[in-house]
Amino acid sequence: ATAPPMKTIKIGTGDEELTLGGETVLFRHEKTFVNKTRYAVELCTCMDDATVDAKLAEIPKVDYDRIGERMYAEIVYVNCDAEATADKYVALVQKAAALGRTLILGCSDPEIAKAALEVCKDSKPVLNGANASNYEAMNAVATAAGVVLGVSGKDLNELYDTTAAIEKLGNKNLVLDTTGADVKETFANTVQVRRAALKDQDRTFGYPSIVNLAKIAGGDYHLQAGLAAMFTMKYGSIVVMERMTYAEALPLYGLRQNVFTDPQKPMRVEPGIYPMNGGDENSLVVTTVDFALTYFLVSGELERSGVPLNLVINDAGGL
């Protein structure tokens, strides 16, 4: 009875461990959002080797800091199309795993999923592929490997029933794939699942959500970027895209950082003296306030100057 209405789920390991869910409010101003939306780039067995290699080379290029936070595509979504063999899928999973990012295995064939998990289960990926027709077998595969299971349904009723059935099997280490047939259905699904969990206290829907934009806006990169912004604000725990370039990343990660900043606490750095460029007690002193954005802008310029100095941060209450 004291557990939060939305379960907190951890995926990945080490530095790449990601925390999803755990939200308690529908709107940021009511308290705060807890765990930020994570972005995934999709690979598919339907792609040729050259396309896969090009995407794998592009993913690490978007990796930068903004106000002390690392901005990069945290997840690689590896999709298994209907024509793929186990060998082909496993080979693609191994290629993706070499990046060192957290993986989501988009696979609804229990045998292929089992083979893929043999090469990556230690990195704690998500196995996204349980549905009304295969949930028992997929649950067994995910449970044996000790990984999070992704659940989907043709509509919310089927998603609810399948999730409830998996819970009865003893597995509550789940994420819900709320992707529908189109943008409208996907948005409605994602919002209704979150409202049911937080407003109606329905714990069957109290799990993080996956929204796959590659399915509902495939090939339209501009639309995917816009939808990623929408689902960042409206309840996508993981948003899957076909690519992540700087053009998409700069506005998207800036938006995410603002949405998932605690409105009760100003973004601030610790007041104090920060030597820069080898500054000592005889060096120039520069002072500014403790608002985080001001600090990172000022400190960046000072570092680039190469002048030894001490940056003194005053306590201005984060303003």
Where are these regions (language model features)?
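Non-heme iron-sulfur electron-transfer modules
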Residues: 1-9
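Conserved mixed alpha/beta catalytic, RNA-binding, or beta-rich assembly cores of soluble enzyme
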Residues: 12, 18-27, 35-319
